[in-house]
Regions:
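PP2C/PPM-type serine/threonine phosphatase catalytic domain
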Residues: 1-285
């Protein structure tokens, strides 16, 4: 696969997203994206700007070595989680974490070539769109539009109407509900996510991509172009991202919409903007 475009931008001072790939731009053998989960602890404990950014940086560094191994994605994930557990233990050994500490987590999507075919792994709600070798479009894993997110966005809008505009204040108010939702991480009744816990290996999704012609990995901040703002369908997002300068152009269009609706009234959402990341790949010819 050839790297057509890659972009990652934070919505604020700290970008909790991340991306990486193996090989060079003309011959990519694996690629991945991260979407760090916004912390609700009231302060950061682990350095790196935020606890989520710390986890993303550690996981990215480990993946640069692990993704090159001739191992199934399931085993690569297992080794990644083991290293993160060791990292977290070292980082917190002298810290007095609160009893209700919300540990760092991140969405992870990775694709890897195995001889002539490609496999994929997903933890969390980032997106993986692909077009098969026959030209047929395949939405392997799109970002879910879940009921809790809609409820949270609606409640946040009420607070903004009353003059509460700071996201940190909103996070503090809704912390009990967010904590309850995060207790469902990596559980049968919840959702999979990357964290420094053995359970993170149990709830990943795996996909056989066959011999795709094109692949787009993107976080939900980038996929807002589809499910929030209606700028694209899944197929047109894939096509636009694969154009020359496409990922930057798509991100510019997202920023334009967000700048025109800072109070989140026209497009209901919890935060005015989100970190956004995308990697676009096309089969070499």
């Amino acid at each position: 696969m050839r790297l057509v475009g890659a972009v990652t931008q934070g919505s604020g001072a700290i970008n909790e997203d991340g991306l990486g790939y193996l090989g060079n731009a003309e011959d990519v053998s694996a690629a991945w994206i991260f979407d760090g989960v916004t912390g609700i602890n009231g302060q950061n404990f682990l350095g790196g700007g935020s606890d989520a950014a710390w986890l993303v940086a550690k996981a990215h560094d480990h993946l640069k070595a692990l993704a090159s191994l001739d191992l199934p994605l399931r085993e690569i994930l297992s080794k990644l989680v083991q290293t993160l557990i060791a990292d977290f233990k070292t980082a917190t050994k002298d810290l007095d974490l609160p009893e209700d500490y919300d540990p760092p987590a991140a969405c992870l999507t990775i694709v890897k070539r195995y001889r002539e075919t490609w496999q994929a792994l997903r933890l969390g709600d980032s997106c993986l769109l692909a077009r098969g070798g026959d030209g047929a479009h395949l939405s392997v894993a799109a970002s879910p539009n879940n009921a809790f997110d809609h409820w949270l966005s609606a409640e946040a809008l009420k607070r903004r109407d009353a003059g509460m505009l700071d996201v940190k204040e909103l996070l503090a108010e809704f912390r009990p509900q967010l904590m309850q939702g995060r207790k469902l991480r990596n559980s049968p009744s919840g959702y999979g996510i990357l964290e420094a816990s053995p359970s993170a290996t149990e709830f990943a999704e795996y996909f056989d991509l066959g011999t795709p012609r094109e692949i787009l990995l993107c976080t939900d901040g980038y996929f807002r172009a589809v499910d929030y703002y209606g700028l694209h369908s899944e197929q047109s997002l894939l096509e636009a991202s694969l154009a020359s300068g496409g990922v930057d152009s798509v991100l510019d269009s997202i920023h334009s919409v967000e700048a025109s609706d800072p109070a989140c009234v026209k497009y209901l959402r919890f935060k005015p903007a989100d970190d956004a990341t995308a990697v676009a790949l096309r089969k070499r010819v």
